[in-house]
Amino acid sequence: MSSSSLKINLQATPTGLGAWRVSFLSLTLAALVTACGGGTSTTAALDPSAPGVTPLPITPPVVNPNTSTTVTPGVYTALLSGKEVTSIVMRNSSTNSASAQLYALQFSAPFDPDIYAGSLSGIGSNSATISNLTYFQNVSGTLRTGSASLTVPSAGLLKTTVSYSATPTEGARDLTWFANPDNRLKLDTPALLETIEGKWVGRWSYAYGYIDNFSLTVSDTGVVSSSMTFQSDCQISNGSVSPALGGVNLFSVSFAVPNATQCFVRSQNLTGVAYVTSSPASGKTQRLQWIATTADGRGVSFRADR
């Protein structure tokens, strides 16, 4: 196939909030992109229809992402090529209100995601940009760098566009998705340690593999610990969670990994975000989502229901 761009248009609703409507042409083009190597491909999810979860009222000064026409902190969800995409925008500066961090999980399989991360400039305006976006691919562990932009084409709709230049082994890539706020998260509820405190058991994903029934414990003071290892000898050390900046219902997370022969993040510090929503799983009431990355973008994710 030539290196000309292909564009795939999908009509989508956010994850768990509605059904996909995909045209036959979209499916045909998706098959062509899968079958042909090289070149630049553009995959786009169109403006999703109204979500099926009623938005909860938001108390100022927290900005309501359902009614805002600017890029604001929060959790946003969509479906792309039939798979979940979750984006988290979190302030990272107490002095610069326009600065934030983006973390995003793109699931190409039911459970284990690719991880995007980067510093945002332009929060509070209609458009924010990332010049240092990293893309850590599940399974292969390939790390790529690129750029991204976040815009709000209409109230309650976050458009994310990411771009990567070609490498010797991979073609250039442009990817766009539209997402709605995750209304299972009461954004203006204070991020209290008592919400995240306790034992969580779920799926720990780290690109080269995963662990089901991974156990993580958060103390009443925000200390995070686990007796389990991943990738043979990666161990969580000096873990902590604390309320994020801006009074939103997000947590800042961090932990260190000691030096270990087989560990892909050995001798590294990881930082990221966590949040607790209502759980869609039968018999469960809470869901924890956790993402943490190294300075260069390699990372892990953890999802647990209790």
Please identify what each model-predicted range represents.
Residues I130-G146, F251-G272:
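An anionic, turn-rich surface loop/hairpin at beta-sheet edges
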Residues A50-S87, L158-Y210, T285-A304:
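Tryptophan-anchored aromatic micro-motifs
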Residues M90-R91, G118-S121, A148-V152, N183, ...:
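Extended lipid/amphipathic-ligand handling interfaces
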Residues T261-R306:
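Hydrophilic extracytoplasmic domains
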Residues G82-T176:
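N-terminal accessory/assembly segment that mediates macromolecular interactions
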Residues N66, T72-N126, G202-P258:
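N-terminal glycine/threonine-rich, aromatic-flanked beta-hairpin/loop signature
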Residues S2-A12, L25-P73, R184-L185, R303-R306:
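Bacterial Sec-dependent N-terminal signal peptides
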